[in-house]
Amino acid sequence: MSYCRQEGKDKIIFVTKEDHETPSSAELIADDPNDPYEDQGLILPNGDINWNCPCLGGMASGPCGEQFKSAFSCFHYSQEEIKGSDCLDQFRGMQECMQKYPDLYPQEDDEEEAEKEKQNKEAEPSVTQSSDTKEESSS
């Protein structure tokens, strides 16, 4: 016999094997585009930027969040023929802020160099002889 249990915001439904064998009669409910908690993607239906989109990777809420929002908004709403060409000051401001926090915003060059150094260290032979061993082998 199937039954349902509510735990906080979650509804847990226990079903039997027979329940699984019969076709579902559940009706799907259309998503509410005005639901503020519903993931809408980067651009909301009204054309605004969804600063809570996980696709931004938290950039809008970090220590340089305001600079990021300024630069990204400028680019998004840019009407220039070369989109974003009117946003250089905002992007420079964002870059200057990010350079103050290299641990949070590593530059691609820094990441590539660190990876190359790591690979070089792993590839180097780590065999060293002590001076005692060298003397014994030469006698």
From Swiss-Prot:
Q: Where is this region: Disordered?
A: 103-139
For bias kind Basic and acidic residues, which ranges apply? 115-124
Identify the residues that the record assigns to the CHCH domain, covering every copy.
Answer: 61-105
The record's keywords, sorted A to Z, are:
Disulfide bond, Mitochondrion, Oxidoreductase, Protein transport, Redox-active center, Translocation, Transport
Report the record's Gene Ontology biological process terms. mitochondrial disulfide relay system; protein import into mitochondrial intermembrane space
The chain's disulfide connectivity reads 53-55, 64-97, 74-87
Q: Which residues form a coiled coil?
A: none
Q: Which GO terms describe its cellular component?
A: mitochondrial intermembrane space
The residue numbers the entry assigns to motif Cx9C motif 1 are: 64-74
Q: Which domain of life is it from?
A: Eukaryota
Please give one Pfam family short name. CHCH
For molecular function, the Gene Ontology terms on record are: protein-disulfide reductase activity
| Function field | Central component of a redox-sensitive mitochondrial intermembrane space import machinery which is required for the biogenesis of respiratory chain complexes. Functions as chaperone and catalyzes the formation of disulfide bonds in substrate proteins, such as COX17 or MICU1. Required for the import and folding of small cysteine-containing proteins (small Tim) in the mitochondrial intermembrane space (IMS). Precursor proteins to be imported into the IMS are translocated in their reduced form into the mitochondria.
The name this protein carries in UniProt is Mitochondrial intermembrane space import and assembly protein 40-A
Q: Which organism is it from?
A: Xenopus laevis
